[in-house]
Amino acid sequence: MFIEIKDIKKSYGSGDSKVQVLKGININIEKGEFCVLLGPSGSGKSTLLNIIGGIDDADSGYISINGEKTENMNEKALTEYRRKHLGYIFQMYNLIPNLNIKENVETGAYLSDNPLDVDEILKTLGLYEHRHKLPSQLSGGQQQRCSIGRAIVKNPDILLCDEPTGALDYNTSKEILKLIETVNQKYNTTIIMVTHNEAIKDMADKVVKL
């Protein structure tokens, strides 16, 4: 398998206030799969995503990517792993306000040894005609498209999505989810998406309830 998540456990706090948010999670994800981590707030979805991304550490268990355990990587190797293999999409867009849309997407390309074509990405996301605009001149949905472009232009193996439609209205959310599905199919990018929205599970190859 491409990603092996083995017996991941994670707690916060100590003593009487200790809370175990992940209680032995096991998931296998194949290359190119669209995996949804589904559950209510506080179920540990984002925590698990952060552990997969090397941002947080598990108390026990391990994550293996192509046979290499992330826990065995030193800080330099972990940074390189994130730079080369991972893309991130969050609920908030986190665009650089004084860069135009094309320049924001290009910041992702600079992190990659094998980036995709920026103009092709902009066209795929329906942003090419807006490429010279600043983020403040775009709608929330268009800004989220830009953040998707920044994530995928680096040509990541894995795209981690943490409630990417949480700040958007229903119709815009549908558009963004369709674009993420297009990315999955067009570039064979492995998608791991955190959501509390039951409707999204129909898009997925694999659904894990937390």
Question: Could you say what each language-model-derived stretch is?
Answer:
Residues 61-69:
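Conserved ABC transporter NBD signature motif
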Residues 53:
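Helix-to-loop junction immediately C-terminal to a conserved catalytic motif
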Residues 134-144:
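Conserved ABC ATPase signature
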Residues 17, 70-87:
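ABC ATPase NBD coupling module
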Residues 99-106:
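Short coil-to-helix segment of the ABC ATPase nucleotide-binding domain corresponding to the Q-loop/switch region
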Residues 159-162:
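Catalytic Walker B motif of ABC-type/P-loop ATPase nucleotide-binding domains
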Residues 153-157:
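A short, proline-enriched helix->beta-strand linker immediately N-terminal to the Walker B motif
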